[in-house]
Amino acid sequence: FNGQYCCHNSYLLNDVLRGEWGFDGVVVSDFGGTHDTQEAIDNGLDMEFGTDLGSLEAFQNYRLGKPYLKLLKQNETSEKVLNEKVRRVLRMMYRTNMSEGRPWGTLASEEHAMAARKIAEEGIVLLKNNNKILPVNIGSLNRILVVGENAVKMMSRDGGSSEAKSKYEVVPLEGIRKYVADRIEVDYQPGYSSTASKSVNDSLHTEAVKAAKGADIVLYIGGMNKNLHMDCEGVDRESYNLPYEQDALIADLSVVNPSLVAVMVCGNAYAMPWHKKVPAIVQAWYGGTEAGNAIADVLFGEVNPSGKLPFSFPVKIEDNAAHAFNAYPGDGETVEYKEGIFVGYRWFEKEKIKPLFAFGHGLSYTSFDYGKITLDKKTIKSTDNITVTIPITNSGNREGAEVVQLYIMDMESSLPRPLKELKGFKKVNLAPGETVKVNFTIGKEALSFYTPERHEWVVEPGKFQILVGTASDDIRSSATFRVER
C-alpha cells in the first residue's frame, strides 16, 4: 500500500491501527508476507509467520530473526522497539493462554458437533424456491436421486491454509440417507468427476440423466471444490461458470425431471445459465464437519433456512467493477482498484446493474411482514444517536428467523457516495403470527465517511434516509432525518 508491504506499512500499522484505533495487541504477518527487516522493525510488525529466506526448517532464518539480531548487536536499531514488541507478545499470552482460571477444554466434543451443525444450518441460503418445492415432503415420494460429486466429497481438507484436519465429516449424501433412513429409496449418481477423463465424464453425465427420469425428485449437489483454480489459495478461478461441465448436466437433468433442487457447495459466486429451469436453488457453502446433516435438515424442513448472501451474485463476470474497468488481473505486478468505494452491491446499484441474486438475499419457508419505521427524533447533531424501530411479523404458518437489514443513504454528501450502505442487521426468531419490534441505534460511526484530503471520518450536515428490508434489493420501509451543524 503506497509503496510499502502491508505487513510492515507505517501508515496502516503505526498511524491507523495503533494510533487512531488504539490497538495494543500483536501484529502477525501473512505467511511469507515480510519483505524488509528494517521496515518490519520500525513499522509495527511483532511476529513473522513464514519466510522466503532459505528453507522453512531454518529456524532463525527470518527477516525478524538473524538479520534483526545482527542489527541489534551492531547497535543499528533500538532495543526499546524490541522491548515494545516483546511486551505486546507477552500481553497476548497472558490474555489468552496463561490465565490461572483457564479451563482445560476439550476437542471435537459433542457440544462442538452441535455448534458446528447449528452454524452450518444458519448459514445455508435459500436462493430460490418456486412452487414451494422445498422442504421435501418424504411422505409423497418413493425415490430420491442424488447427483453430483460434492454429495460425497469431503471439503474440510485441502484448499491450502484453509485445510483442517477434522476428526470426521458428514458428507451430504450421508446426511440425506441418515435422515431418510429406510422410509424411501435414495439412489446416487456422481454425474461428473473432478479427476476423470472427458470420456468417463460423458458416461457419468449420461447415466445420471438416465437415472433422473425415474426419480420423484432430484437433489443435485455440485458446485466447486478446493482444487487449483477453484476455492483455493494462490491461484484465481479460470471461469465464472461451474467446472466439469456442470451447467450442461444441470440443464439436461431439468429437462427429464422438473422436480430438481440444486444444492451448491462452494464459497463463491458463479454463473447460472440454468437458473430459470431449476425450481429451487440452495447455497450451502462449505459447512464443515456437520455439513451433510445441516443440508439434510434444511432440505427436509427440520430447519427453516435463514441465511443471507454476504455478497452479490452477478449474472455475468463482466458485471463486476474490476472486469467492467478491465482492471483485473492488472499487469502481473500491480492492480489498480478503479471502482474506488463502489464495491459489490454499491457498484451494482450505482450502475443500475441487476444482479442474479442481490447482497442480503435469502428466502425462508415462512414469510415476514415489515411495518412502518419510526424514529425517536427527526433532527440530530453529528454527535447524537438516533433510535430506529420497526415491527416485524411472521405472517406464515411455521417458526422462522429473519435477518432485518438497515441501510443508510447520504442524500446530500459533498463527495460521491454509494446509493446506500448496510449499517446494521439483526436476526430475530418468530413464531407463527408473532410480532416483535426491532431496534437499531444509529450514531456518528454509521453516518460518517472518510475524507482522503483530511485523513479523517466526518459527518456532514444534511438529509439522510434510513431504509430497512429483507435484502439490499428488497427494501420494505424508509424514513428520513436531518443532521444539523
Functional labels for PLM-detected ranges:
Residues F23-E57:
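Short acidic/histidine-rich active-site segments
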Residues G3-H8, R18-G22, V28-T37, G65, ...:
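C-terminal non-catalytic regions of proteins with extracellular/luminal or membrane-system context
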Residues Y11:
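Catalytic core of the metallo-beta-lactamase
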Residues G44, E57-E100:
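Long, well-ordered, tryptophan-enriched scaffold segments
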Residues R102-E110:
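Short glycine/proline- and acidic residue-enriched helix-loop micro-motifs
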Residues L45-D52, L56-F59, I373-L375, K444-Y450:
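Compositionally biased, low-complexity linear motifs
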